[in-house]
Amino acid sequence: MSIFLNKDSKVIVQGITGGEGTKHTARMLAAGTQIVGGVNARKAGTTVSHVDANGAAVELPVFATVAEAMAATGADVSVAFVPPAFTKDASIEAIDAGIGLLVIITEGVPVKDSAELWAHAKATGNNTRIIGPNCPGIITPGEAL
């Protein structure tokens, strides 16, 4: 039984084209997580190639915004692998889009930025659950990573 993440969760990766995003997307796919795309405004309209848990090649679309990714894929979870300087804006974008769960992996996020993104989430009232910043991720054994 999962609390936040399960085999049916549709996950987008903010920062999918960066080094950490690329590495961890591969690991999540290998664990069976249903990654449905990524977000990078500068690389929107492209795809990234990976291999899923069954060894099959997958092409993941890259979108300009979280809202666009959610509309196209039905994503309900976002995991953020963005540099600390961009974490607040990326998080607020996901919150404003109404993502159900936001997992912020990034470490070194300024405390002020963390406080502001949490205050923004509370003010919107859209019930986005946030784990992080500076989080090692979440796992539901046998279902998703």
Predicted regions and their residues:
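Rossmann-fold NAD(P) dinucleotide-binding segment
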Residues: 71-77, 81, 85-108
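Generic hydrophobic/aromatic pocket-lining and core-packing "Φ" positions
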Residues: 25, 66, 91-95
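N-terminal Rossmann-fold NAD(P) dinucleotide-binding loop
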Residues: 21-22, 87
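NAD(P)-binding Rossmann-fold cofactor-contacting core
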Residues: 29-55, 133
